[in-house]
Design a protein with these regions (language model features):
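Class I SAM-dependent transferase core
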Residues: 1-84, 92-96, 100, 113-124, ...
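Conserved nucleotide-cofactor-binding alpha/beta core module
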Residues: 76-195
Length: 208
């Protein structure tokens, strides 16, 4: 018999994701599988599947389910990619990526969040394709570059161009950019040149 969280998770996938245009079978499957309630503080678990962000401590948030799905779908993952995630946060987006991508390299500047996500993903999910690092995302992770995909879960005022050098040819970056007025932007690399495509308006915590 399905528990309450499982029922809420199914409703989230149908009502918040599929109904709003998320079509990637891999993304929908991952979102239906990962128990979001494990990634939020106990006091917020009753709100785990609402269509909104939730606080996770240290001034950070876990993004609303639709935005997680939208950004993941926009990465156009096929299953063979190495992904750089800047902003591990709770580890929820990390888990979604780990379900689809070949390898996930995830960075977080707040040690407590990085350690908490590492412990959760290791103990509960036993992922073997996730590598963690505590550090500033603006600098990227040159030791593991190049990356086929990158995703930022916090917004820089201006996109750190050093990351473009760490992106593979044909690679894609999905990132919120801006201050008060933020836009989600898709960057793609073709023949060494970067093309930027504006997607939607968003609200993220600033990249620090």
């Amino acid at each position: 018999m399905a528990d309450t969280y499982e029922i809420q998770r199914r409703a989230m996938v149908e009502g918040q994701l599929r109904a709003r245009g998320i079509r990637s079978a891999a993304v929908l499957q991952a979102m239906a599988k990962i128990p979001r309630q494990l990634f939020v503080p106990e006091a917020e678990r009753v709100n785990s599947y609402i269509n909104g962000p939730l606080p996770i401590g240290f001034g950070q948030t876990i993004s609303q389910p639709y935005i997680v799905a939208y950004m993941t779908e926009a990465l156009e993952l096929r299953g063979s990619e190495k992904v750089l995630e800047i902003g591990t946060g709770s580890g929820y987006q990390t888990a979604i990526l780990a379900e689809i991508a070949a390898q996930v390299c995830t960075m977080e500047v707040i040690p407590e969040l990085s350690c908490g996500a590492r412990e959760l993903l290791s103990a509960v999910f036993n992922y073997k394709n996730v590598i963690f690092k505590i550090g500033r995302g603006q600098e990227g992770w040159p030791e593991f570059a190049p990356f086929d995909r990158m995703i930022l879960t916090a917004a820089p005022g201006q996109f750190p161009e050093v990351l473009f050098a760490q992106l593979s040819e044909g690679g894609i970056i999905i990132a919120p950019v801006g201050g008060v007025d933020q836009r989600l932007v898709r960057y793609s690399k073709r023949v060494g040149k970067i093309e930027a495509t504006d997607l939607i308006g968003v609200i993220f915590v600033p990249l620090v």
